Swiss-Prot record:
Protein name: Recombination protein RecR
Molecular-function annotations in GO: DNA binding; zinc ion binding
SMART domains reported for this sequence: TOPRIM
InterPro entries tied to this protein: DNA_Rcmb_RecR, Rcmb_RecR, Rcmb_RecR_Znf, TOPRIM_dom, TOPRIM_RecR
Protein origin, superkingdom: Bacteria
Annotated function: May play a role in DNA repair. It seems to be involved in an RecBC-independent recombinational process of DNA repair. It may act with RecF and RecO.
Annotated organism of origin: Streptococcus thermophilus (strain ATCC BAA-250 / LMG 18311)
Keyword field: DNA damage, DNA recombination, DNA repair, Metal-binding, Zinc, Zinc-finger
Length: 198
């Protein structure tokens, strides 16, 4: 269908978002133009503010508006454990269960040989540097149960084992191919309680 140029551009912009197909992008575009000017301005202002004000924590790599982030500066956290996740959404999912009280490390991606993403392309070097001068005795790998998540998990385990650091993986309450951010709280709780050593 042929749309006026401004709508077509808006549809194109929405369709660049992950998980948004042509139909959803079209619905979002038409909904957006039906919003009041005030609501559209607020939406645009909030989008720009998030883009400008957020940064990655210099310690853990999590998206934050403070650097270092509130988790890294919390002295009540267990500093002997680091839970490694793919992205900041996974930190939020784990924090929701209120069971894990250690630190985090956000990789900002996964090793993906099929897509040409190697260990140097994700936030992995800073994890190794972080471990060298710390009291961490366990690294818990909480990558998604996908081929890339498994490849990343095995690589991290292989790199850290010689250093004598215990490396564990979340238990398999998570279905293969599932994303941590979509898992329910009970599944995440069981996965962390029953983690296995790699």
């Amino acid at each position: 269908m042929l749309y006026p140029t401004p709508i077509a551009k808006l549809i194109d912009s929405f369709s660049k978002l992950p998980g948004i197909g042509a139909k959803t992008a079209t619905r979002l575009a038409f909904y957006t133009i039906s919003m009041s000017d005030e609501d559209v301005n607020d939406f645009a202002k909030n989008l720009l503010a998030a883009k400008r004000e957020l940064t990655y924590c210099s310690v853990c790599g999590r998206l934050t508006d403070d650097d270092p982030c509130i988790i890294c500066t919390d002295e009540t956290r267990d500093r002997t454990k680091i839970l490694v996740v793919e992205d900041s959404k996974d930190v939020s999912a784990m924090e929701k269960i209120q069971e894990y009280r250690g630190l985090y490390h956000v990789l900002q991606g996964l090793i993906s040989p099929m897509n040409g993403v190697g260990p140097d392309d994700i936030n992995l070097k800073s994890l190794i540097t972080r471990l060298m001068d710390s009291e961490v005795d366990e690294v818990i790998i909480a990558t998604n149960a996908t081929a890339d998540g498994e490849a990343t998990s095995m690589y991290i385990s292989r790199v850290l084992k010689p250093a004598g650091i215990k490396v564990t993986r979340l238990a398999r309450g998570l279905a293969v191919g599932s994303d941590i951010e979509y898992a329910d709280e009970v599944t995440l709780l069981r996965a962390i309680e029953n983690r296995t050593e790699l």
